[in-house]
Amino acid sequence: MEFKEFQDLKLSALGFGAMRLPTVGGDPNGAVDEKLTAEMVAYARAQGVNYFDTAYGYHDGMSEVVMGNILGQYPRESFYLADKFPGYDLANMDKVEEIFEEQLKKCGVDYFDFYLFHNVYEKNIEPYMDEKYGIMDYLWRQKQAGRIRHLGFSAHGRYETLKRFLEAYGDRMEFCQIQLNYLDWKLQDAKAKVELLNEYKIPIWVMEPLRGGKLATLSQENEAKLKA
């Protein structure tokens, strides 16, 4: 396993995402197969993976519970856990404290190693930045209290939206997670986003490197283009 230095940490270059966990009977809408997931986590750890990523809405809220149950079997200092505030749903904006406390409980931890503003984009940037909801203020207090070790954000929005968020909070963001792969390099303007984040000296976390597996298998024509 390759490791990347982040401040005083050494993070596995490959993380374990808990958005698409195996389900009972392979039913995409079924319950998470916790036994199989535990086997996957054990295998990943054996290969050196130490970064695990979950979120409030994954698997209808059960991803956090399952990952908490499984990771709780290991020493807390042996893994890094990332979770996210679900601002993709505007109904959550006035519930930041309630949701954060719930997430800690579901994951069975006292702190998150990494915590993100989930999916900053055009429809939620206003409430994310609205002092009425106080999301940044609350999360910053949790960081100061040690309940969030590193604060960052993920982004699916346009370049202009990313720039605006950075202009407001770039001095407080320690990392950013963006969709980065050979398709989105141009399709979602990832190249320009990378350059912007580099200007702010904000480390980049890669998500969707294969777009959920869709980029793993190509037609012969497109495979030839990539190799050309």
Where are the language model's segments positioned?
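Conserved, mostly hydrophobic/aromatic
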Residues: 14-16, 44, 52, 67, ...
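Beta/alpha (TIM)-barrel catalytic core signal, keyed to glycine-rich beta->alpha loops juxtaposed to Asp/Glu
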Residues: 120-228
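Short, acidic/polar
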Residues: 30-44, 91-108, 157-167
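Acidic (Asp/Glu)-rich catalytic clusters
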Residues: 6-10, 45-46, 68-78, 101-110, ...
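A short, structured active-site edge motif that brings together acidic residues
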Residues: 77-89, 115-118, 178
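N-terminal binding-site loop/beta-alpha segment at the start of enzyme catalytic domains
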Residues: 1-79, 138, 144
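Active-site groove signature of glycoside hydrolases
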Residues: 104-127
